Every structure is written in C-alpha cells, then in structure tokens.
C-alpha cells in the first residue's frame, strides 16, 4: 500500500513539474510551436511518465526513510509531538510576518534569501523550544485549570495521579514486585516504560551468562504481572531522546505522569528524593516486615565466613540479613550464640553487628 501511495505522489509531482518546466525546454529545442507537443496535457503526461520510471529506483529509499521516520515518531510521547508542533507553528507564523515586512524592501538579499533563512531558523527554534519547555507549558495549563476546580476535584485528581506506579529495571529483575502486586499492597496502575523493556531485552541478549539470566528473569516477571487479571498494566511507548540514561528518563516520566517510581536501586532512590519525585523502595518494605532486632538481644547463628576487618566473622539470618560478629573468625563453620550490639538500617538493607555471648 505504501509503495503505491509513493508512486501516486511521484506521478502528481512529475505531472506538475512537467507542466511548469517542459514548455521552456520545448522552446529551447525549437519545437515550441508544435501544439501536439507543447501543451499542458502532453507536458503533464511526459513529466508523470518520467517520474513514474524514477520510482522503480527511488521507491525503496523513500519507503525506508518513511519507515524510519514512523519508527522514530512512535517512540516520541504525544505531549512532545503536540508541544513541538505548536512551537513550530508559532515559529512559522513569526517568520511569515517578518518575511512580509522584508519583502517590501528593494534590497534583493533581504527580500529573497533572508525570508527563507528566517523560515528555517524560526521554525526549528520554535520546534525545539516547544519540546524543551513542554513540562513548563503543561504545568502552566494545569495550574490554570486547577484554579477552576473544587477542592474535592483536586483531591480526586491528586489521588488518581499517585496511582501510577512506574517500575524500573532493577525492581523487575529482583522479582519480588510480582508478589507484592499480587497481594494488593500496591494499588493503582502499573506503568512499564518501553525504554525499560528495551533495557531488559538488551540484558537478556547479553553474552554474559549471569546478565542474560537476570534479563530473562525480568522478562518472565513482566509476563507474569501482565497475565494477572487483578493488576492494571499500561505500556508507556514514549521516550526522552535528549536523555540517554534510563534512570533519568524514569524521573522525567514520573514528573510528566505525576506517578511514583518503584525501585530497589539505592542511587535512583536518592536521585528521586533530591528532585522531589515520589519513590517507593521495596527494600524499605522488606526491611519493615523483618523481625525487629534490639541491642542486647541474643540469637543463635551459624558462622559461615570471615569478615573484612580483623577477626570478624559473618553469619546470616533466615531472611538474608547479614550479621557481622566481632571476634567471630575463630568460630567459622560453628553454631554459636551471639549478642546484638547495634543495627544499621538503610534503604539498601539491614546489617546487624554482634559479639559472642
């Protein structure tokens, strides 16, 4: 279908070009007086035929270019296209009025070359400004609409915004998010950005065995989440091409959608907090449901290896919590009773420090 559309466009372009260009050629060739040749119908037919023959060579290149453009546009968010188009329109309108003013002058350079340059430059600047300032324009429109809403409507909208849970790559690979969503601890719509899916696919195609296993596990987790009827899943097909890092794209997406980033990445957690973006770290949830351990409490553990510091030993609880035991190196591969001295709690996890009792 696309091939025939391209050929029809070439036919129309060829016919138009023939009507406007061939009469001058006939005059130069000395056959302009022959009405059978020098008439609009013959010119259009010859031009259309020439351009149609060109399509047999050019159609594949035009089709490839259109497919490439379609693929690029499909990755751009609708808001980006809308604001970019508005910026382009404003730029072209300004260029139109400026060109009209310049065309009144008698200076050849100003009334011929400069208007073309102005159209190109102002159109491009308008498009770029529209894209780069789309968030500010969106916030401006939202603020104006917010003044017209009642407090009840604002609360309802704020609640609906916060229901978007945007998953990052690390939390998908981790796998625990599937169980959390299934149990209903997280409400709202789960958003899977296309750029996160692309990163997962890239990891799954890695030559490194460990990375490949992690990537495939992440894809399996996504399929499991999508098949759950109780979980609302949306794919975000937009992209932020000016931002190469996936983490930065997630932060921008959360700002645009008004959603919450769900992660277990400590660094992304801190970046979101710094930029005032709501974030849920499932490590915080995991730590919250772990049994509370207080200094002075005694427990029985199996010493499995030595620690980083001198004479330290390392043991683990059943939930995976690391216990660093002072002077515990000599008890490796032995089950001993220890006394808790302190507990270190962070978003990255929990660590218990103890000594032999």
Curated annotation (Swiss-Prot):
Its EC number is 3.1.-.-. Mg(2+) binds at residues 229, 247. InterPro entries: Nucleic_acid_metab_PIN/TRAM, PIN-like_dom_sf, PIN_dom, TRAM_dom. Keywords: Hydrolase, Magnesium, Metal-binding, Nuclease. SMART domains: PINc. GO terms for molecular function: metal ion binding; nuclease activity. Belongs to the ycf81 family. This is Uncharacterized PIN and TRAM-domain containing protein Lmo0234.
